[in-house]
């Protein structure tokens, strides 16, 4: 705990593990099972409950509550975990719940993520690296969010939904189906509105790869033949495309929800 400073009004329970150069501000409460990495900063009135691990160089702002019990009626009170990666920014009023003992027992957040005011992560979610949640964005239990995803303000994601890497969810959208990698979803209920071209360029994808994915997505959702056949056709036609391979892999993994499709994409695809 070399260099660590704890405000006299803060409550750090016996057994809590604090790294070096940690800053704990006024009226914070840290549980006995918490593990706080080096150079973390808790500004004031931060509550860290249960077995919560906060990665190095993360900053948590006022009235955030991390590691509370899951909002899951099947949870029986067993020991579960919230694991947050390094260099995350967690703004005012953010809530993240531990996993539930009826499921994986873990809620996992990756490195270099940003969670703006009042964002919410429910039990048993897995959030990747470099993810951004805008104000009041929220995901229900068991949701998987890939790397570099951006979720707009006030957007909500249904339980068990998968969000592919580099996807974008527009503000005040309600996503109830799996969103393919690089996809953009907007509206209530959210529909696939195209590709996250800006995100693809940031990921270093070449122009031809972006064009390939555009054509591949059109093939996937044209309803000219059974969905599995369309997936195989796309995989065969665009076998050299990195982005198309990502989408095909995502689809073949198969989640518990149907897919987020274009507005005129016909019936639900599972």
Curated annotation (Swiss-Prot):
One GO term of the biological process aspect: lipid A biosynthetic process
Protein location: Cytoplasm
Pathway(s) it belongs to: Glycolipid biosynthesis; lipid IV(A) biosynthesis; lipid IV(A) from (3R)-3-hydroxytetradecanoyl-[acyl-carrier-protein] and UDP-N-acetyl-alpha-D-glucosamine: step 1/6
Its EC number(s): 2.3.1.129
Keyword Repeat: yes
GO cellular component: cytoplasm; membrane
UniProt catalytic activity: a (3R)-hydroxyacyl-[ACP] + UDP-N-acetyl-alpha-D-glucosamine = a UDP-3-O-[(3R)-3-hydroxyacyl]-N-acetyl-alpha-D-glucosamine + holo-[ACP]
Keywords carried by this UniProt record: Acyltransferase, Cytoplasm, Lipid A biosynthesis, Lipid biosynthesis, Lipid metabolism, Repeat, Transferase
Gene Ontology molecular function terms on file: acyl-[acyl-carrier-protein]-UDP-N-acetylglucosamine O-acyltransferase activity
Top-tier EC class: transferase
UniProt xrefs under CDD domains: LbH_UDP-GlcNAc_AT (cd03351)
Quaternary structure and partners: Homotrimer.
UniProt similarity note: Belongs to the transferase hexapeptide repeat family. LpxA subfamily.
Biological role: Involved in the biosynthesis of lipid A, a phosphorylated glycolipid that anchors the lipopolysaccharide to the outer membrane of the cell.
Protein name per Swiss-Prot or TrEMBL: Acyl-[acyl-carrier-protein]--UDP-N-acetylglucosamine O-acyltransferase
Organism: Bartonella tribocorum (strain CIP 105476 / IBS 506)
């Amino acid at each position: 705990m070399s260099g660590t400073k704890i405000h006299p009004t803060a409550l750090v329970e016996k057994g809590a593990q604090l790294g070096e150069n940690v800053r704990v501000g006024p009226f914070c409460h840290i549980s006995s099972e918490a593990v706080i990495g080096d150079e973390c900063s808790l500004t004031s009135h931060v509550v860290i409950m249960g077995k919560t691990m906060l990665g190095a160089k993360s900053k948590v702002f006022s009235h955030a509550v991390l590691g509370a019990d899951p909002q899951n009626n099947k949870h029986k009170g067993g020991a579960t975990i919230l694991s947050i990666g390094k260099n995350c920014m967690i703004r005012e009023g953010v809530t993240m719940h531990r996993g539930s003992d009826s499921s994986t027992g873990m809620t996992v957040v990756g490195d270099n993520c940003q969670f703006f005011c009042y964002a919410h992560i429910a039990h048993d979610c897995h959030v990747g690296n470099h993810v951004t949640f805008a104000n009041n964005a929220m995901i229900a239990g068991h949701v998987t969010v890939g790397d570099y995803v951006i979720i707009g303000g006030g957007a909500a994601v249904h339980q068990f939904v998968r969000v592919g890497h580099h996807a974008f969810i527009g503000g005040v959208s309600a996503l109830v189906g799996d969103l393919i990698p690089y996809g953009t979803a907007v509206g209530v209920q959210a529909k696939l509105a195209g590709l996250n071209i800006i995100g693809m360029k940031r990921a270093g994808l070449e122009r031809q790869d972006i064009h390939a994915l555009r054509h591949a997505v059109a093939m996937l959702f044209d309803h000219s033949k059974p969905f599995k056949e369309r997936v195989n056709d796309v995989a065969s036609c665009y076998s050299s495309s990195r982005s198309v391979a990502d989408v095909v892999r995502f689809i073949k993994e198969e989640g518990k929800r149907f897919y987020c499709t274009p507005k005129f994409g016909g019936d639900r695809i599972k």
